[in-house]
Amino acid sequence: MDYSTSDLCDHFADVVDVLEPMFINFGGRHSFGGRIKTVKCFENNELIRELLSQDGTDLVLLIDGGGSTRRALIDIELAELALENNWQGIIVYGAVRHVDEIEELDLGIQAIASIPVAADSQGAGEDGIGVNFAGVSFFDDDFIYADSTGIVLSAEELELEIVEI
């Protein structure tokens, strides 16, 4: 479903948190959202691969990469894996690579930067935990909505059908 985060902020100002404006759209789907699954890992994407291998129907993977821009946590292989397993999108507090290929996919991907250097795959990290970045605290099963204007978070699913676009 396409929507505008600006309209969501107008209609749901009392129930949404707005992330600080630091994210860039890299995926081919510019409006995406869903229930979040959290993962925290630093310059290492093995746990990300494990999560994206699971069914992601109506889910957005929210990655706390510590804001590191030294190594890309998402590459074309992981983005294609997410698409194959029906993930709505990925939000990375960190970097991505293979940007030209990723923008061709019908998948929402936002991150703070791109870099050609790959992440390690040592298996370190935690999933299903609360994380905090961009001025907001995130928990598994919160709802996130993203577009080219910004990203908003809600503890409950928003009734998008009442918003006129």
Swiss-Prot record:
GO cellular component, one term: cytoplasm
Pfam family, one: RraA-like
Chief location bin: cytoplasm
Gene3D superfamilies documented for this protein: Ribonuclease E inhibitor RraA/RraA-like
MF (Gene Ontology): endoribonuclease inhibitor activity; enzyme binding
Family matches, as InterPro entries: RraA, RraA/RraA-like, RraA/RraA-like_sf, RraA_gpbac
Endpoints of the signal sequence: none
Record keywords, A-Z: Cytoplasm
One GO BP: regulation of RNA metabolic process
The keyword Nucleotide-binding belongs to this UniProt entry's keyword annotation: no
Subcellular location: Cytoplasm
Transmembrane listed as a keyword: no
Intrachain disulfide bonds: none
Origin: domain of life: Bacteria
Family per similarity comment: Belongs to the RraA family.
NCBIfam families per record: NOT-MenG (TIGR01935), PRK09372.1 (NF006875), RraA_entero (TIGR02998)
Subunit structure: Homotrimer. Binds to both RNA-binding sites in the C-terminal region of Rne and to RhlB.
Role played: Globally modulates RNA abundance by binding to RNase E (Rne) and regulating its endonucleolytic activity. Can modulate Rne action in a substrate-dependent manner by altering the composition of the degradosome. Modulates RNA-binding and helicase activities of the degradosome.
Protein name per UniProt: Regulator of ribonuclease activity A
Organism encoding this protein: Pseudoalteromonas translucida (strain TAC 125)
Gene that this polypeptide is encoded by: rraA
